[in-house]
Amino acid sequence: VLRDSDGEVAFSALPFSYEYAAREVFGDETISTPADVIEAQLTAARAHVPKGARWVVVAHAFVAGGAVGETERALTRVGGIETVPAEVFEGADYVSLGHLHKPQEVGSANIRYSGAPLAFGFDEAGDQKSMTIVDVKKDGIDVRTVPFRPLRQVRSLTGVFADILAGTPTDDFVQVILTDEIPLIDPMKRLRATYPNAC
């Protein structure tokens, strides 16, 4: 619990947990889904939030409605992908989520993935990276994003070897897809002279 000019702000950090572990920790054999796990964690956390305090929840979860990229794996269980409905977070003033790489709101403006600061795959080429700044006020939240450019971007280049080799040198992470019709001998070694982080 922290204090600012508007009073107390309680923070609850919920660790990712599988159902079997949550059943043991909470002594509740009815926990059978990721939503049940989050609900049990929130019930326990809520008991420690002082009356009148604003409440910020931090969680690693796959919340229904989130936009998934190529490199994020769904939290899959027997029977399908298990998502957590946004409604389980009702009562929290702000929910800061981790798992999905693209910054996005899920369910409502106070439930948000901040996004990954670095690209994890070439499907994220061209995505604007940002950080999320949240002001949790007594009368609501103010969310703003601050865009930034990581030291290295990810890019995908497609074309014939000679054209790509003649491109502008960069330290970015570059995926190279060659379209030459004849086999080339060790093209990667030569490409790395121009693109040291090519793959």
Annotated model-derived regions:
Residues 1-199:
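Extended recognition/assembly regions associated with phosphoester-bond processing machinery
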